[in-house]
Amino acid sequence: MPSDILVVAALGRPFTLGALYDARKDKLYPGFTLWEHEVLEESTVESDQPSSTFEITASDSIDDKSSLMDIEASLKASFLGGLIEVGGSAKYLNDTKKFKNQSRVTLQYKATTSFKQLMTNLETKHVEYSEYFQNIEATHVVIGILYGANAFFVFDSDKVDSSNVQDIQGSMEAVIKKIPSVEISGQGSVQLTSEESDITNSFSCKFHGDFHLPSNPTTFEDAVKTYQQLPQMMGKETAVPMTVWLVPMTNFYSEAPQLMADSSTPILRKVRNTLEAMRQLDMRCNDSLERRHSEAGFHCLKKKLKTFQKHYERLHVNPFRKNHFPETFSPSGKGTKMKLQCLPTFRNKLRSPSNINSLNMWMDCAEREINVLRSCIDIIEEAKHKVVLSKSQMARELDDSEVKHAVCYVFTYVTDYDPFLNALSDFSKSIKPKKYSPSKKDYWYTSDDVPEMMREKAHHFYNLAKDMENRCVRFLVASIVNPKEEGAAIHYYREGIQIINDFSNPRIPPVETIQDQESYSGMTVSSPWKETAHPALHLSEGNKKAMSGKPQPSDNNPKRFDHYQQVLCNKGLSKRHYWEVEWCGYVRAGITYKGIQRKTFASECSLGHTDMSWVFDYYPKSGYHHIYNNKKVRVKVASPGFDRLGVYLDWPAGTLSFYMVTSTWVTHLHTFSIRFNEAVYPAFLIGHGQKNANGQIKLKGE
């Protein structure tokens, strides 16, 4: 009779001496034994075997995890096939990294306490045979158990840039190696250097162990305290089976089934390699799903990624679970090694659309698509745009009564349709599915021309948006499938109606010819800046209104005008802006650089008297003028004149224009052509103290 002893890892299973075990399925039959309880107790020999070790690993592979837990090849195959349910510290086997761009370091504490074995001369003595032996497919009997406990502290960093993974992992390993020797102060806190604290604050901790803890550690400091308590918690009464020795059942019962030679190594290697590749694929998919998906286009990609994940889990991972394919891991006949039965199923997987090469190729394409869209979104990130995720949301934006113009950057090729995903779905449902492998020709983003064109349009959209300060113009980003428009387009809407499919440069009419005030509607500027206001200027109505009067006490603020009754707005302008001024009395309105002098009667302090400011003025006795660099030019206006001045700044084009405003119509008065070299500020002179002239302005267009 064969008398080979088999050694297996317990993996949290409730082994007892004399228990029956089917090594072909790695199935334990708890509660069944060949001997009476009294015989087992009389035949048990126990010896102390105290030991403790710790080990650190940065690997997350199933092979290295199995090595830490002393799991041999056949048992590993059963675990991969889902035949055994692990418990206690063995749950560490199921704990895998979620992201590729994540550092992981694991600390193992392992202790043993005692070894129990049955006397070897038991053989058939006192064996209690019964009919149930004919129904139990046990191949072995437990004759020895090593007791102890395992503890795994799994430290994970946050998701980081791929270039930093190795550096962070090295830093983590260095500080985790110190855990057995880290000192704890009298106050119970862990003593670390500031650099070590910075490192440990960036990662979390998970615990898998055979110890009963009040609460599991979640931080590095918790882990240190728990680790140092483990030796005191270890005792014979708390120890669990760690390693089990078994002898063939045929030693006691000749009709028992036998375990034949294990020839499953080739298929085991294939299964292991494929499942490891699937784990890597899952992390890549999680990395992509974790990225921001609020932007237009990305919600379609998220939907495709989730569908992809669902299909490969069903087609590639679940087939190795007995609940889905019980015949895969059932014995093909008495005495044979059943794990070989999964070979045909596994070969079918390698020939199917769900083979790992095809899955990785699809994931390469998905990552490429994400990167192309991300590059476009990054370009327009700083533009004041709004993402539109549905047709109804688009309609709401366009129907907004305040919006007269809308410019929309549209991803035209982003869709949730995918031929490869359809093939995966077909394969899972059909008896004779079609063969299919993803081809780069199926995907637009694998070319160079289309992504480059999309980025060019993204730059153009950004330039349009960044130069516009107009509440009546809205910039949107959306995904609208249209194969006729390659990759991306810029749509222009006017009052909710699409006017242009591929909007390039907006046609800005010459400033001298504009007559409709609506051309400028919605462009805004900020209110006058109280800190700059001359003491004789009184601001009201949220600083929108300013009038001259009796000087008030004021501080000696260096920003304040001390001599000329002037005030600036508080925000510099460097885009396109329009504002209106209701005025009366002695008034000037225009723009200036921030560096205008504030504390002197000299001409460089007065608006329009240097090359730093451009203004239009009104004085009841002399009429209207435009002034620049101390050159004052009269502008003829028909009687009775006007009390509302429109000012249009086109900073990018280098123009400043003034208009007479009546109702909704404007009449061009004058345009300065200027080469701006910095932001400019709306500025006003209101009244003149020496001339005993008062003035008043009220700012519109805010």
Swiss-Prot record:
PROSITE patterns in UniProt: B302_SPRY (PS50188)
Glycosylation sites: N94, N101, N286
Chain intervals for the UniProt region annotation (Thioredoxin (THX) domain): 388-515
Post-translational modification: Intrachain disulfide bonds may be present in the heterodimer.
Domain B30.2/SPRY positions: 504-702
One GO BP: killing of cells of another organism
Keywords: Cytolysis, Disulfide bond, Glycoprotein, Hemolysis, Myotoxin, Neurotoxin, Secreted, Toxin
Record region (Structural MACPF/CDC pore-forming domain): 2-264
GO molecular function, one term: toxin activity
Residue segments, region Structural FAT domain: 265-387
Cellular compartment(s): Secreted
InterPro entries: B30.2/SPRY (IPR001870), B30.2/SPRY_sf (IPR043136), ConA-like_dom_sf (IPR013320), Cytolytic_pore-forming_toxin (IPR052090), PRY (IPR006574), SNTX_MACPF/CDC-like_dom (IPR056072), SPRY_dom (IPR003877), Stonustoxin-like_helical (IPR048997)
Record-level GO cellular component terms: extracellular region
Predominant cellular place of this UniProt entry's protein: secreted
Entry-linked Pfam families: MACPF_SNTX (PF24674), PRY (PF13765), SPRY (PF00622), Stonustoxin_helical (PF21109), Thioredoxin_11 (PF18078)
Subunit structure of this chain's protein: Heterodimer of alpha and beta subunits; non-covalently linked. Also associates into tetramers or even higher aggregates.
Domain notes per entry: The first domain (residues 2-265) is structurally homologous to the membrane attack complex-ferforin/cholesterol-dependent cytolysin (MACPF/CDC) pore-forming domain. It makes numerous contacts with the FAT domain and comprise essentially the core pore-forming machinery.
PANTHER family on file: AIG1-TYPE G DOMAIN-CONTAINING PROTEIN, SI:CH211-281L24.3
Assigned protein family: Belongs to the SNTX/VTX toxin family.
Purpose of the protein: This heterodimer induces potent hemolytic activities (when tested on rabbit erythrocytes, EC(50)=25-56 ng/mL) due to its ability to form pores in the cell membrane. The pore may be composed of 10 alpha/beta heterodimers. The toxin shows cardiovascular effects that include a vasorelaxant action that may involve the L-arginine-nitric oxid synthase pathway. In addition, it displays edema-inducing activities, increases vascular permeability. It also shows myotoxic activities and interferes irreversibly with neuromuscular function.
Protein name in the entry: Cytolytic toxin-beta
Source species of the chain: Scorpaena plumieri (Spotted scorpionfish)
